[in-house]
Design a protein with these regions (language model features):
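Long, non-catalytic architectural segments outside compact domain cores
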Residues: 1-32, 36, 40-43, 47, ...
Length: 60
């Protein structure tokens, strides 16, 4: 599992690369991981997506 600082860092990196569309991409990665039976990975992707949403809300 990633610590909170790493989750925020990765979320920020995805937002820089993909813009606000990163949230949808991150959620899609969570769905893919879950479909492949990897609940831990899916949880991590969802945490990163949630951090990306929080970052976007701070920018408003």
């Amino acid at each position: 599992m990633m610590d909170d600082a790493d989750v925020r860092r990765v979320a920020a990196e995805h937002l820089q690369r993909r813009g606000p569309g990163a949230v949808d991409w991150l959620l899609e990665q969570a769905k893919i991981a879950y479909a492949q039976g990897n609940a831990d990975s899916a949880h991590t992707w969802r945490e990163i997506a949630e951090a990306a949403v929080a970052i976007l809300q701070l920018e408003i």
